Amino acid sequence: MFLAQEIIRKKRDGHALSDEEIRFFINGIRDNTISEGQIAALAMTIFFHDMTMPERVSLTMAMRDSGTVLDWKSLHLNGPIVDKHSTGGVGDVTSLMLGPMVAACGGYIPMISGRGLGHTGGTLDKLESIPGFDIFPDDNRFREIIKDVGVAIIGQTSSLAPADKRFYATRDITATVDSIPLITASILAKKLAEGLDALVMDVKVGSGAFMPTYELSEALAEAIVGVANGAGVRTTALLTDMNQVLASSAGNAVEVREAVQFLTGEYRNPRLFDVTMALCVEMLISGKLAKDDAEARAKLQAVLDNGKAAEVFGRMVAAQKGPTDFVENYAKYLPTAMLTKAVYADTEGFVSEMDTRALGMAVVAMGGGRRQASDTIDYSVGFTDMARLGDQVDGQRPLAVIHAKDENSWQEASKAVKAAIKLADKAPESTPTVYRRISE
């Protein structure tokens, strides 16, 4: 038997906690036998003293084990259980293509996703722009969809990593969110509860990233790879660029439209293609569905070319109560904004810099995201035809096309776009989409 205050004291004095001490504390968070003050105190001591790798693994596994851990053995699946997690960005719609692409190659992807947070878009919000789409199927239905379709994208239920929910709520109001061991445990507790064989992390870098600097993004990626592998799940991470909007669009319905166009081959943004393919390659190799990069890319390109990936997406939408003909008739089903109009730069030039975070907040301000949990989302608003770094803009080439609910909203958004995009006399040097791969 342990005392919470003695565990806090031990960490306060700079000592490493044992696995048993960490499990006692996390179980107490779940059972409400540990107070909010005690959670805050431990979080602050971890913030200042960090954690060793064994402590980080113990914390993550204790949080994972605070609730249900999915077990797929009874389904006798003939492929690996794999997933991807992104630290979030703007126009980051990779999940909607990646899940079906990997499923079409023989993987099973039980993706538990989140809503928009701050300036970043949420996969669940995007999917809810599809009429009828059910993000909370019951457990049996979730398992059926995984077995039959190969991929389902759902919301987090209260039974998955419940200790994380309470721990995070306290961190949020005590300035202890940005601690790498705590971020790592929070992300991985939920992902490892999916019962995965392999995981790839997409850690964003740049003006629209969760972490403010390249070095911190790199440190987070290394921590996640170390802890997840320590917890027994084959994990790699990619550091990918978020110095500009990833897709050509940012919003909810507009990103779903782009995802369908990507899968069917109607239109593929080259940067979005690069990042999506790179993440899928990691999933296929870690999941032992391909032996190397070349084989993985060939398999992925094949399921795009032969329509299998698009077919899997359509089957997932139908299985989660969306329209059965969504892929064929997406334009009929997705909501459209009242006003769609381009915004142009005041001068000619080359796009040299983009405040991606500000563009994400502009989508939120238009109604495309939540400022507080009770807000309702306008799924139709957002940006399309976004200019990319290096593009020449003038009276013919707009900065973006704005989808707004009215003229006032359009005016505010156009000001935000102009303020967020800087122009120069010559094009900047191109930057990579993937900066670094991190493995154990």
From Swiss-Prot:
Reactions it catalyzes: thymidine + phosphate = 2-deoxy-alpha-D-ribose 1-phosphate + thymine
One GO cellular component term noted in the UniProt record for this chain: cytosol
Gene3D superfamilies referenced in this protein's UniProt entry, alphabetically: Nucleoside phosphorylase/phosphoribosyltransferase catalytic domain, Pyrimidine nucleoside phosphorylase-like, C-terminal domain, Transferase, Pyrimidine Nucleoside Phosphorylase, Chain C
GO molecular function, one term: 1,4-alpha-oligoglucan phosphorylase activity
UniProt entry keywords in alphabetical sequence: Glycosyltransferase, Transferase
Pfam families: Glycos_trans_3N (PF02885), Glycos_transf_3 (PF00591), PYNP_C (PF07831)
GO biological process entries: pyrimidine nucleobase metabolic process; thymidine metabolic process
Keyword Glycosyltransferase in record: yes
Function, as annotated: The enzymes which catalyze the reversible phosphorolysis of pyrimidine nucleosides are involved in the degradation of these compounds and in their utilization as carbon and energy sources, or in the rescue of pyrimidine bases for nucleotide synthesis.
Similarity annotation: Belongs to the thymidine/pyrimidine-nucleoside phosphorylase family.
Name recorded for this polypeptide: Thymidine phosphorylase
The organism's taxonomic lineage, starting at the top: Bacteria, Pseudomonadati, Pseudomonadota, Gammaproteobacteria, Enterobacterales
